[in-house]
Amino acid sequence: MTVLSRFTFGLALAALVATSAAPLSADQAKELRIGYQKDGVLLIVKQQGALEKRLAQAGVKLSWVEFQSGPPLLEALNSGAIDIGQTGDTPPIYAQAAGSKLVYLAAAPDLGKRSGILVRADSGITKVADLKGKRVAFTRGSSAHNVVVRLLANAGLTFADIQPVDLQPADAAAAFRNGGIDAWAIWDPFFALGQRFPNARTLTDAEKAPSNRFFLAGADYAAQNPDAVSTFVQELDRASRWATAHPADLATLFSSVTGVDPDVEKIVAARDVYTIHYLDNAIIHQQQQIADAFQQLGLIPHAVDVRAIAYVPSAKARAALAQAERQ
């Protein structure tokens, strides 16, 4: 089994931690189903187990469902198969345009170091402008889709100047290695793994296209379970602060789950930023700019209003997060 296969299908190892928190109210839903990918702060939350313990105090069962990318995760969210999940910036824009009933709960900054475009070293492609007419793979509707759109624009190209190839990460990796595509836009840890492929070269990272990752919920779930949502965001914050303080342990945790070389996971951990925020005007504005660009390019059928589906936490929830940050 390849390293990439172990990453995609590897078994998770639990690392439970204790927590002291008030129980949730008794009228919450009795199950919370979270969709996740094998990276980032949500994986930390899963492995450390504190959220599971806090929910159990109110008799709420926690279950986890793994996804390889954001678009299928949000399809599951819209269908009611999961209640909460994490994606990059682009999947919720497509989901909102398609009429999905979801809300943005919180955001984590993505400074662009954890995503980029890989090319074959013998391709003759030395700058983004050289992608004109080339086969560029990414998952349609994923954060990599936005990376391609924005980096092309920065280089004076449009989306119509390339041959887009819609592939999930594992399929794109195989196509890249066998020469079936010219370039691959992808995020960590796939990005870090791809950088180690023979004959692979990093064309650029996405530092010139910074954005956010988002934690989203079904609209009905968020409205009916404010205490569970507040607890979830508090645990995201706690896990983020732990990650910032324990980079070596973080790489070990990631490697234990993904099967990826710890040295690769150290790179992944170092390129990320671990902070959590409820959505503010700046975050909403940045996401709206992406949505507007996709509508203008005809990539979504109509304009969407990001603010209309931004979750508004109660004063109690904001105070609880502020208190958690001081602990």
Regions found by a protein language model. Name each.
Residues 8-20:
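Bacterial N-terminal signal peptides
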Residues 21-26:
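Sec/Tat signal peptide C-region and signal peptidase I cleavage site
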Residues 27-157, 165-166, 182-185:
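Short, glycine-/small- and polar/acidic-enriched structural segments
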Residues 41-42, 111-117, 200-201, 211-215, ...:
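Small-molecule pocket liners
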Residues 53-59, 275-283, 306:
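Short, solvent-exposed loop/beta-turn-alpha elements that line the ligand-binding surface or hinge
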Residues 90, 161-165, 170-257:
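Pocket-lining segment of extracytoplasmic ligand-binding domains
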Residues 223-301:
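Secondary-structure end/capping motifs
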Residues 294-327:
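Conserved C-terminal helix/tail region of periplasmic/extracytoplasmic solute-binding proteins
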